[in-house]
Amino acid sequence: MAKAPKRAFVCNECGADYPRWQGQCSACHAWNTITEMRIAASPQVARNERLSGYAGNAGVSKVQKLSDISLEALPRFSTGFKEFDRVLGGGVVPGSAILIGGNPGAGKSTLLLQTLCKLAEGMKTLYVTGEESLQQVAMRAHRLGLPTANLNMLSETSIEQICQIADEEKPQLMVIDSIQVMHMADVQSSPGSVAQVRETAAYLTRFAKTRGVAIVMVGHVTKDGSLAGPKVLEHCIDCSVLLDGDADSRFRTLRSHKNRFGAVNELGVFAMTEQGLREVSNPSAIFLSRGDEITSGSSVMVVWEGTRPLLVEILALVDHSMMSNPRRVAVGLEQNRLAILLAVLHRHGGLQMADQDVFVNVVGGVKVTETSADLALLLAMVSSLRDRPLPQDLVVFGEVGLAGEIRPVPSGQERISEAAKHGFRRAIVPAANVPKKVPEGMQIFGVKKLSDALSVFDDL
């Protein structure tokens, strides 16, 4: 007699499970996201496959010395986009499982379709679509002017059927669009549920490891911009990248959040055109599109994204508030960091903005999370408050502590060299980041305290 399916209550946002229903998830604090699921007992064969691991079949595993394992590097192959290769750590590793997410309309399917059409000229590829019909994909490829003669297409949502066909076709690269619509027959829940996403992703990852085929899975995102589905989805894959971009901007940023074969937080920049996505080889140029007129409240900083320095402009507007509670708005920067810096500026800089509205924005839609932007943000706000522009050939970076000290940041020499390459001739940096060999024609101001930076600003 077959066993009755088990019941579980699982959060659709984070995947946490509970013995009974409750209104709010204790893990992610989301409301009304816990649903009941019936989990059927998995067949014995499937259980044995899960226990065998990713690297081999059950019964043939053996203990090996770490020194005896081959150190031969896996040969990567290029995607045809240098920016995409940069984010992946130098190209696609055979047998890797990659997850790419992004908002609807960001260009995930377009980027992967362009990539596979290029690679199909020299290797065997397979594009599996579960959301769009084959005719819709063909129409998009025709509109973008892509070569379609050698690209293999498949419209299927059953993971078992997809892997069976992949075993026959033996592609080197396979795209699954998207993981949220795929399903397994053994999992008794609807496609897109936590159990289905978890099991299908684990099945595809195991298939990639044992067959040596690279698999790229497209994932949806939640309303706050994070990848939808259980957190275990990001744990079982090798690389997780996010394609981001505002709806009113033609630029897209591709950022790695997890990468077992390269640097994390690596950034690639693309531009959406009528012919699809085109890579931007010099991102600093698009983020520094400053006009001829010098305005107050503008400063240029150097941020470090993955393995590359990037020049970004910060805009600040400080204006007298007509309300009892002045507004503090930060776009592209952390709101809490802005509040801390305003307090430091009042305490150690002698400038108070308690009666001022403060608006700050990072040009180009870039999101800056590192603290090296502190000093540039403070000087931009002081510039707007005094209505006195900073010189256009000035670049600023440095972390500001709670005691008003200017702390050094990593890769100071590389940041200064990047600024000099783009024509900047003056820089305000932490004293510990002043290089021993200053680039020719560049003047460096090393500061130890916030008051020193304000004094340099007064003398410019």
Protein language model features and the residues they cover:
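Conserved RecA-like ASCE P-loop NTPase motor core of nucleic-acid helicases/translocases
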Residues: 125-129
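P-loop (Walker A) phosphate-binding loop of NTP-binding proteins
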Residues: 103, 130
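Peripheral, non-AAA+ core regions of ATP-driven protein-machinery
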Residues: 2-13, 17-86, 93-99, 106-117, ...
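Divalent metal-dependent catalytic cores for phosphoryl transfer on phosphate-bearing substrates
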Residues: 134
